[in-house]
Amino acid sequence: MARLSIAVIFAAASVLLSVTARACPALIEGVPPDRLKALSQGVNADGWIADPRSAPPRSLLRELRKAGLSHIRLPVPADFVMPRFAAKAEIDGRLRSVDAALKTLLELGYSVSIDLHSGERFNALHKDDPPGAMAEMKSAWTGLARVMQRHPYDRVFAELLNEPDVDAAQWQNEVRELAGFIRGLLPQTTLITGPVNWQRADSLPDFTPLDDPNVVYAIHFYDPMVFTHQAHWDPNEPLHDVSGLPYPIRADDPRVQQLREQLTALGKPKTLAMVDRAIPDRGIDQWLEPAAAWQRQYSHPIIINEFGVLKAGAPRDSRLRWLAGVTAYARQQCWGWTHWEMSQGFGLADAVTGKPDREALRALLGTR
């Protein structure tokens, strides 16, 4: 099959979006415009703090900055900076890694969001002992705030907790307390937070914004999952058996028909049902409309802080088309976006050369 040109992919992305161009929604005053601009296009640097040896090369960071990315989301594994799960010496070492990463990124001209990234041990504590979890979050943010206070407050932002894995009512109560605590430590810092349930767009309508005006609200987007997570790394996951599924997903596409036949022959009814549920695809604008409606109601800024497609099984032209569609929609809504992620399975860097994938960058940035 001939490779589609990037121009064709951009044109297809425009067709996939059923919304028409519109003016940016009016927002309440609170987050300075220069910070919203800094958050407008970025990438996650996953793994850097978990293993500083895996830090992205400075040359890659420089190239991405030159291409136009302005924001790095820096996940900090919660289990590594909480005294319930880590000794003081380990916590101090992780905080030094955060400080070093901030120095590097700020020198290169990025703005950075520090993301307290929940893990299995913290998630279990969060469900079983909410007061204990709150104490750990406050301890983690006390340490992180000490690091952040060494750097410009208008370029380093605080993301309260990635993908809270508790029910909506619990998190709604906790987020007010946690945000107030962090605001006491970082009076001028922009905060970032979002809803439960993987921070899906359709979970945002059940989330009440904070009284604090200097907050950006983050959603994550991976729909349809059967496309974005095909060839899943876990062999026990049904999506492990999906590969070559195109986007958009149409019943009359020969590739979809062939995949359905393969899954039937393999005796994979659960996986087959996941493919069938994605036919016909709803379209990016329809998946994200609940978040747009929430913004129209509350007038707060939104960022798509994670989105991406696993490269292992997705057709390249479809991956580029999906990425272009997501960021085109974000631009129409005047939302920021942060691609997941830089150098791993969803990565923006080429696995062989370690250099930026130029076509993926053009798809994200909407340039030719």
Predicted feature locations:
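Bacterial N-terminal signal peptides
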Residues: 7-18
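Acidic-and-aromatic substrate-binding clefts and catalytic sites of carbohydrate-active enzymes
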Residues: 48-56, 79-93, 135, 164-169, ...
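Active-site region of glycoside hydrolase catalytic domains
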Residues: 26, 135-278, 285, 289-309, ...
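A cross-family glycoside hydrolase active-site/sugar-binding cleft signature
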Residues: 44-46, 73-77, 113-117, 159-161, ...
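Aromatic-rich peripheral "rim/lid" segments of glycoside hydrolase catalytic domains that contact
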Residues: 312-368
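An active-site-proximal structural segment forming one wall of the substrate-binding cleft
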Residues: 53-56, 61-70, 76, 90-116, ...
